[in-house]
Every structure is written in structure tokens, then in C-alpha cells.
Swiss-Prot record:
Residues where Phosphoserine is found: 167, 552
UniProt-listed Pfam families: CECR6_TMEM121
Skewed-composition ranges (Gly residues): 54-67
Gene from which this protein is expressed: TMEM121B
Designated name of the protein: Transmembrane protein 121B
Amino acid sequence: MRPALGHPRSVSSASGSFPPPPAAARLQPLFLRGGSFRGRRGSGDSSTSTSTSRGGGGGRRGGGGGSPSSSTGAEREDDDESLSVSKPLVPNAALLGPPAQVGAPAGPAPVAFSSSAATSSSTSTPTSSCSMTAADFGGGAAAGAVGGPGSRSAGGAGGTGTGSGASCCPCCCCCGCPDRPGRRGRRRGCAPSPRCRWGYQALSVVLLLAQGGLLDLYLIAVTDLYWCSWIATDLVVVVGWAIFFAKNSRGRRGGAASGAHNHHLHHHHAAPPLHLPAPSAATAGAKARGARGGAGGAGGGLGAAAAAGEFAFAYLAWLIYSIAFTPKVVLILGTSILDLIELRAPFGTTGFRLTMALSVPLLYSLVRAISEAGAPPGSAGPLLLQPQRHRAAGCFLGTCLDLLDSFTLVELMLEGRVPLPAHLRYLLIAVYFLTLASPVLWLYELNAAAAAAASWGQASGPGSCSRLLRLLGGCLVDVPLLALRCLLVVSYQQPLSIFMLKNLFFLGCRGLEALEGCWDRGNRASPSRARGGYGAPPSAPPPPPPPPQGGSQLGHCISENEGGAHGYVNTLAVASQN
């Protein structure tokens, strides 16, 4: 390699106050150094010409003058600028190894590529953690992608060679979260931040205790019923919900830890070299894609399993609550306890209505407690939610409307405006508790959909089981509510309600979903319709494009002289300086 030009006196004067320029920095191309060529003249590690000009500067500081030396250094600097374009980026000794080392294992490949730069780089330190020389670029790429088996570990962890495949980006490409540096400058990866989501869980327990305690107060204060059974029922419900929250949080923590481990395998990898011939580059890219796909497949399966555990046992929690809540309210509404509440209770029937209405915020707290804890940091707002959480939000809104509809029917009994017979009163109570228990169906649907997505390892979509559950929920809730509304309008001269339009709209939507499911089963072979199904297996990846004709990847745009092992890097350096 051509030695650096410079006056002996100026170099010796600079050696006392500044370290010698590293030899690896002279091999570094412009696009890897960062900044413009003109702006890096005085940095001390950019090129040979800057070391010469620094020597002149040292002479000026040492002797107070030094103008002839500085002018001579400037002239030599301009000469070196013109020569650095045609200067090879890697010594010629490094070019002898690649033809025989392409099919070799990952161990000797970095040694062959970095043999000439080992002695010079031992006395110099890199200026940045993200900078790399051309020898490191060639050696690390060859060790990471062409090394055969074990190349991923050699490139990712550094191995024994000079180049390493570790990424130096400050953020995580998988989740978008900023990477948090650990102690002593080590990187922690994209482990999820321990955001505390115990607020909604605590609110759920408080609402359970408040509603159960008020109903117990009504049953115990105004009657002679035995009070231990009601309090024991409330304690059983609270303990069941606490166990559910504990299992849900434990499953989510396990899924987050496995996802963080698989992110390290997915994110920190070495890219295939850009200067290899076309067949070798295609083989290296296929190996890299295969290794990445294996790690990503495992991570995707674990992530889907964690998503499947997100709504697990939620339907059991709401079912336990519905079973414990129903006897108390039925006992109050079906007997004379309601009249005693109006006479003896502090707030009368208004307090009882508010106690019954606590079911809606309780359902909201349950949905938020199991969905917000697994949400990514940037998923604020309904349009940025995952499909399962989007579906849960829509089902919650529909359940709120159904509960409001059924509660207005129950108020006819509380106010006594319409003299309803006993069988119609019990029918109204039955419809109300069917509506109250309807979230069990869509919570189970979300759990089954997540389990199906975890088994196939892909995103969830509407399947036949979920459409059947939606249609069943519509038949159990909307049909009885609409029938009762029509009966009250015809037989008891009640005015038309806007909830009748709501019932018709929901029934029409669920009927269309059922018809769409039947149509999808008939056209399951269509790729556009099979893309969004639950049970459709993942499609095969498209075949790789055919390799270009010629001896190298850029054989159609560069000459044969530049088509060697490092011709691609030289071409980019010339283009960036022009």
C-alpha cells in the first residue's frame, strides 16, 4: 500500500502532542466516516492528508511560525485528496483470500480478511461504536453470511474476527421502543418497560366489593335473612377474580420475557455481503432468511401464545360474577323487598338502580385490565389497537347498549307505571340477566380466536366458530328484547322506542356476518378470502428472484476491473465523493 506523504520534520513535531493516525482509518471510505470530506480535515483520524496538515499545525504551535510547512502540507493534502479516490480501500494482501475462503467455515474467514489490518488496528482505537473500516466490513460480512454453519453466532457476537454483526441503531426495529442502555454501556434490547397496570384491576375489585356490599346491605338490613351466606358469596367472587388477574399477569410476563429473548436473535444479525458474486449472494441471503425465519417463527409462536393468554379465563371470571349477582337481584325484584327498600333504605330505589348500574363500569374495568397491560407503548387510541382489542372494544359498546335497553325495561317494574302480570315480570328479569351474562360469549370468542391464531402462528380473523357465537349472542339478546318491545307497544300501548331500531340493526349485522361465513366456506380456495381466516395455514413465501446475469451483483453497471471483492465499496466511495 502507498505510504503517506509528509515532511519528516512536520511529522516528528506532531508525534509529540498527537497520537499517530490509525492505519484502519486510512482504509475507511467516505460514506462510513460520516460528515463531509472538507469538514473532517482537522479531526486526526480521517485520512493521511489530515495527519500531514496536523503536523504543520503542530509545528506552528511549537515554534510560533511554520508557514512554509503549512503551505507544503496544504499542497500535499490536495494531492492526497485526488489520490484517495483511486487508492484501494483494502490492502492487496487481503484480496488473495476470498476466492478460496468462500465455502469455508466461519472461523478462518475473518482472519483471512483482516490479516493485513490486525497489526495496524492494534495500536488504534475506534472513534465511534458504530464506525467500521473497510476490512471490518468485508471480514464481518463474509464471516456473518458466507461462513456456513455457525455464521450467525460469529457475526452476531463478534466471534474471533474483526467484524461483528451487532447492530448500532439506537432504537428497536421490532417494537419501535427506544433501546435502554444498561450498566457499563451494555444494551438491554427491547425488553418491555414494567408499566404498572394494577389500577384497573384494583378498580374491578373495589367495584365488586361495593356492589356486593350494597346488595348485602339491602338483603340484611330490611329482612331477617342469614347474612353469612351473602358475604361468603362476595368473598368467593373477589378471590376468583384475584386468581384470574394473577394468572393473567404471570402468563403475560412469561410471554414478554420470551419475546425479548427472541428479539435479540432477530435484531442482532449480520447482513449478507454486497460484493459477492450473484450465486454466492443468493445462497447467503437464503441462509440468512432461513435463520431469521426460524427465530422469528419461534418468537411469533410465543407472542401468539402470550396473546392467547391475554383473554384466557376472562369469560370464567364474568360467569362467576353473573352467577353470584343474579340471585340477589332476582330476590329483590321478585319479592316485597323492593317495597321495603323504598321505605327504609337511605336512597330508596334510586340507590338500588345505581347499584345495578355498577355492572357496566365493572365490565369496562375488566376489559381494560386485561387489554391495556399487554398493549405496546405507542398504541394509544382505538385505531392503533390490535384486532383482538379492537373487537373487545366493539363488543363492550354493544353490551352497554343491550344493558341500557334491558335496564329501561326493568325500570317499568321499579316505577310501577305499567301493571305487568307476574309472568311478564319474570320474563323481563330473565332477559336482563341474559343480557348481563352475554359478555361470556364474546370473551370466550376472543380467547378461542387467540388460541387458534397461536396454533397457526398468524394474525386472527373471523372464523366459523366466532360467527356462530356472534349469531348466538344476537339471538339470545336482541330477539327477546325486540319481542318484549313489540309486546309492550301492541298490548300495553307503550310508545315506540329507539332501542327497537338498535335491535333490528344488530340482528341484521350478525345475520350478514353469518352469511359471509357461509360464502367464505364455499370460496375457501380463493387466496384473497383465505388471507383473513382463523384456520387458514400460513402461505408459502414467494420464490426468490432469479440471479442477475454476470459475474457480480453490479456487473451490468460497473466494469470488470471494479467487479472484484471490494469493487462495490470502491464504486460507492467514488460516487459519494463526486
